[in-house]
């Protein structure tokens, strides 16, 4: 456990170093003119694309990265750190990204819950059939899917 804590502490120190380094590159009293607030059609397009990117990232990675705590914990820690920045561009952008990330995660959780409910109903329906109508291989596949969803 102590190795995990040391690694976790190092990771957090790296995030704070990155935040400090990034903040030093940008004037804290910036003009407020950054991609999320910049006027113009191309920046409006960026704003929409940025939000879509975060949602698509979660949707595409729902079977791979979301089940691995390491990248998600790091991403959430990074966004949390930047949302506390004195630089408005970092603060607003990371807060928006975090909100889109959480919204997308809720969508994935809802889909998973719906799949679990459907699977449970199908399993119960198949199990309640008479012995002559029941398909053992179907029961087995539904049970496997149930285990996979949990």
Swiss-Prot record:
- Read off the InterPro entries from this record: Cohesin_Scc3/SA (IPR039662), STAG (IPR013721)
Source organism's superkingdom? Eukaryota
Q: One short Pfam family name for this protein?
A: STAG
Q: Which family does it belong to?
A: Belongs to the SCC3 family.
| Protein's recorded name | Putative STAG3-like protein 4
Q: What organism, scientifically named, is this protein from? A: Homo sapiens (Human)
């Amino acid at each position: 456990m102590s190795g995990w804590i040391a690694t976790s502490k190092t990771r957090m120190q790296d995030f704070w170093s990155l935040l400090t380094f990034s903040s030093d590159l940008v004037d804290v009293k910036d003009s407020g003119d950054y991609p999320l607030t910049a006027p113009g059609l191309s920046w409006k397009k960026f704003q929409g694309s940025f939000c879509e990117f975060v949602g698509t990232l979660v949707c595409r990675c729902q079977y791979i990265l979301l089940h691995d705590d390491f990248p998600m914990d790091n991403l959430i820690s990074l966004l949390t750190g930047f949302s506390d920045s004195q630089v408005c561009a970092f603060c607003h952008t990371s807060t928006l990204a975090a909100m889109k990330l959480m919204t997308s995660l809720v969508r994935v959780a809802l889909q998973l819950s719906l799949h679990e409910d459907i699977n449970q109903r199908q399993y119960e329906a198949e199990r309640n059939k008479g012995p002559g109508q029941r398909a053992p291989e179907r029961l087995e596949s539904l049970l496997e899917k149930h285990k996979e969803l949990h």
